[in-house]
């Protein structure tokens, strides 16, 4: 609950929607304490609504089209299912258009079932699923976060409390190959930073030279 709200909002928007969410390190799910969600919901929705989408040769656009018809069908199907699911609420976005290119609006879905497939499946697109937990349920939520998805490439923790950052990072050691503190999940600097995943996302074997040995 002690996080910097502005930094968190920027990280969620950029982490989820840069490159249309089509990068391996994109943020696809977020677990937010209820007190934090209440503080940032309006700003998060507004910032997402403000994102422009269109021709990538026009540098005023933040997003372009998703890569192909199969990706579009996967994203459109997931959004249609979310709209029909009483456990889900579309906070912003949700529209798709394939008349010219394969465009998927940046979308945030509020999910009230922590075992929902939106929190475990990898859509690889501009869809951010958010689960809001009660502030006092942090330990149970960390267990959920650690156990829900088979993928474990990147993650991020936001807090001004250094002790909390250290405790949570240790608890989630196997939940992400690259775990960022107070920064969005992103790519690595090849040859300078270890980058890789855990579990279904690999074993830190992609870049970073001898630094990869630090995991063991």
Where do the language-model regions lie?
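ALDH superfamily catalytic-core signature
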Residues: 1-114, 132-139, 143-147, 181, ...
